[in-house]
Amino acid sequence: MMNRRIFLKNSSLFALVAGMPSLTFKQKFKLGYSAITWGGKDLVAIEEIASLGFKGIQLRANTYAPFKDKPEELKAALDKAGLQLVMFSSGNVEVDPSKVEATIQQHVNHAKFVKALGGNAIQLTNSLRKKDQIPTEQELIRLAEVMNEIGAKTKELGVQATYHNHMSQWGETPEEVDTIVKHMDPSKIQLELDVAHYFQGGGDPAEAVLKYKKVLHSLHIKDVESPIIGQESNPKSYKFVELGEGKVNLVQVFKNLEKINFKGWAIVELDGVPSPTKTPLQCGTTSRNFLRDKISYQF
């Protein structure tokens, strides 16, 4: 009878442990947080992101003008908070031949700034998509080619260029992203997969993690409410929300990151507070708690 009780107890314990989230995530990849939610109040963002327990931060190009001649001041703020600059939003890429030289120089300048801040990666986006436009294959290839040129230059500085997929840009749909990625030279530019933009564009971000594992440099971890509650009559409406508050299967994304043994940075991003009643810190706390409770990430 005693042996049976011990067996049942051990069996129940095994079942409980088996049903728990994996506790190995922290050893595989690193979590950062983007300052974009603070709307340009970057010094506040640095303090509050650190207070949430994150060790990495993404800053934007708006920090370049005020700190380009004194990067040591911004780096001192990062160092004091115990934060590493893990990604820098370097802005748009132009493909017009008359603008290519300037666009390359812009990102080279940002790469030098990033290096001075102790970082080693920049994010490239674009504003090339016109209303109701579907870019041609040749246009998407041209974008990849220019990004290859940028990446070649920044790599000389020790800074990795990454392509960020995005709604309302060239690279909105999974098919467009695929064309771009196929023509990227991984030795020069790699992929920063935004899971919510990829989802909203019609893709499965968890599958994209597997598909692009060889070129996956980093990710934006975010969630999206789609359609917006109260706007169901417009199926294309959407807004970005805190982790766990939207429709992206984030747990599966993390499972697949574990499957491919991903060791890079997964950066939590929320473009703005989803409600005027919330603060960036409150939103960050919600997302931090999701990561702690759902994937057992240890902050």
PLM feature spans:
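Histidine-acidic metal/acid-base catalytic patches
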Residues: 5-17, 27-31, 39, 43-50, ...
